[in-house]
Amino acid sequence: MAIASLERDDHGNPRFRGCTSIRDFEFLGKLGEGTFGEVYKARSKKDGSIVALKKILMHNEKDGFPITALREIKLLKMLSHRNILQLKEMAVERSKGDGRKKPSMYMVTPYMEHDLSGLLENPAVNFTEPQIKCYMLQLLEGLKYLHGNRILHRDMKAANLLISNNGVLQIADFGLARPYDEPPPEPGKGGGEAKRDYTTLVVTRWYRPPELLLQLRRYTTAIDMWGVGCVFGEMFKGKPILAGSSDLNQTQLIFNLVGTPTEENMPGWSSLPGCEGVKSFGYKPGSLREVFKDQNPMAISLLEELLKLDWRKRINAIDAINHPYFSSPPFPARPGELPSFEDSHEFDRRRFRGQRGAIPPAPAGGSVDQQQTTEIAVFPVLHALAGSLHTGFKTILQSALLKTGMLYHMDLQTRGSRFQASLVQKIAACLLNLLCLLIHHGAWVIQIGRHVREVNAIISEDGPMGNWIHTSRLTVTLVDILEKGKAIVRVPLLIGVIWNSNTLMKGINRVILGTDVLQEREAGVLTFERLEQRIEHCTDDDKLVLVSTDAERLRQMNPVTLLVLNDSKFITHLLLSMTY
C-alpha cells in the first residue's frame, strides 16, 4: 500500500491539514484556567494575528482524547457564522525527552478581548440599552443559526459569550453541545416537541431552565432560550438574576420570579420526575415585572417570553429577533459603534471583583459532563448542617463529626476497571460510615437518591463505553432532620459507574417505605418478612434502604438493596480520602 508523503514543518515534524505546531505561536500570557484546561493569549508567527490557545487537558493519557473535546472540535469545524466562535486549527506541542509521553493539543481560535460575564463584573462598564439590544440581536442570530442546523448548545451563559473590541459577540464553549434529532424551530411555534430522551446533566445551574430542574428528558431548543433570558436580565442587573445555591433553591428562585407552575402555565409539570420536591412551595404569582420595573414595557415583554415556564410556548430565536423590543426606540447600536474596554477575562475578573466587592459564588452544580479532570474540594459538614438539625440531635452529631473530619464534595471523571472497583469500595465505605454514624445517634430511616436514568442518557449519547466511568458527580448533603431525635436523612447521591460493559451499578431513586411500614416499626411489629414483601415489588429505580444490626439476614435479601449496618466498628473513617 502506497503511503502519501507528508508535508513537514520547519522542525522536520509531519504537518497535517488543520493541525500546526505550537512552536508557530508566541505565548503572550494566560487568560484563564480551570477543569476544562488552560487558555492563553498568543501571536501567530506566520501572520502576526492574535489568537487564543485552549489547551486540552489529558487527565489520563491511556484513555485517549477527551470525548467532550472531540465533540466541541467536531461541531466547531462544521459551523460557520459571524456569531459563532471559529476554530481556526489545532496546534500540537510534542513532548520533550524520550517521546513516550503523548503530545499536548491546543484549540486555536480568534482572540476575543472579553467575555460577557467579565464585562458585567467590570465596575467601569455600564451597558446602555442600544448596546444591550446589539448584543442580544447577535446572540439570537447565533442561536437561530445553531438551532436551524439542529444543534443544541446546552450551556448558554454569560461566561460563554465572547465579545471583541469591535463589538462582535460570539457564542463559545461547545463542550456540552450536541446534534438535535428534531426539526428546526419554526416561526410562531416555540421550540416544538422532542421525540427522544436526552441527559438532564447539562446547563450551569444559574441558567438551567425549570423543566431540566424537574428532570424533563425530552427537552428542546427552548433550554437555550431560557439561558438567553437569564443573560438578558443579567445585562440589565449587572449580575446573575437567578443565583441558586442548590437545585432546590434554584427552583424556588425561578418560581419566585416567574410564578409557581400550574397545569395552565406549565402543562405536564406535575408528572415530571422532579416535581415532588417542589409541590409544597405554595402559590406565588411571580415578581418579574416588579424586579425589572425600571425597564421599558417591551423589554419586560421579551423577558417574559424568554422566561416562560411552558417550554413548548417559550419564544424561539426566530420570533425573538422579530420582537417589537428591537424595533422600538432606543434602537440597537451597530457593533462598530460600541465602545471598547480593557480586556475582561478570568484573571482580569479577579481584579474587578476586588474593586466591586463580593459577588455570588460560582455555580456549585455546573455542567456535570463538562468537567475534564478530578477536582476535590473540602466541604465542611458542620457548615452544611447549620440550622437544619433539631438542637439535641445536632449537638450529638456535631460532636461526633468533629472527631472524624469532614465530607468531600467531588467532581470527577475517570475511566478504568481497576479504578472503578477501588472507587466503588471507597465511596461505599464512606457512605456506610456516614449512615451508621447517623443511625448510631438517632436516625432511623435513611433515604438515598440516585438517578440511574441520567447516567444511562450520558452513556447512550456517545455510544458503548465499555469499562468507563464517563461522568460522575458525588454530592453528599444532609437535610430534613425531624424532631425528637428520630430523623429522616436524605442523602442525594448521583454517581454513574459502569461496572463492566453489561452491568450498571444499581442505585436507589426513592424510598418506598410507606407510612404503614413506618407505623409498624414504631409499634415494634415490623418483620423481615414484611420488608421482603416490599422488596419483591421494587423496580430497578425503587430500591429499599434497610437499617439493621442483623447483617446476615440482610445479606440474604435482594442483592441490589443497600445494606446499612448499625455497627459501631464501621463508625471509624468518615473522611473520604482518595489520591488520583
From Swiss-Prot:
Predominant subcellular localization, coarse grouping: nucleus
Domain Protein kinase: 25-326
Record carries keyword Nucleus: yes
SUPFAM superfamilies listed in its UniProt record: Protein kinase-like (PK-like)
Enzyme Commission identifier(s): 2.7.11.22, 2.7.11.23
One Pfam family here: Pkinase
Gene3D superfamilies named among the record's database cross-references: Phosphorylase Kinase, domain 1 (3.30.200.20), Transferase(Phosphotransferase) domain 1 (1.10.510.10)
Amino-acid positions noted as binding ATP in the UniProt annotation, renumbered to this chain: L31, G32, E33, G34, T35, F36, G37, E38, V39, K54
GO cellular component: chromatin; nucleus; P-TEFb complex; P-TEFb-cap methyltransferase complex
Subcellular location per the Swiss-Prot or TrEMBL entry: Nucleus
Active site feature: D155
Keyword Nucleus: yes
Keywords, comma-separated and alphabetical: ATP-binding, Kinase, Nucleotide-binding, Nucleus, Serine/threonine-protein kinase, Transferase
Molecular function (Gene Ontology), one example: ATP binding
Family in the record: Belongs to the protein kinase superfamily. CMGC Ser/Thr protein kinase family. CDC2/CDKX subfamily.
Protein name as it appears in the record: Serine/threonine-protein kinase bur1
Species assigned in the record: Aspergillus fumigatus (strain ATCC MYA-4609 / CBS 101355 / FGSC A1100 / Af293)
Phylogenetic classification of the source organism: Eukaryota, Fungi, Dikarya, Ascomycota, Pezizomycotina
Gene symbol of the encoding locus: bur1
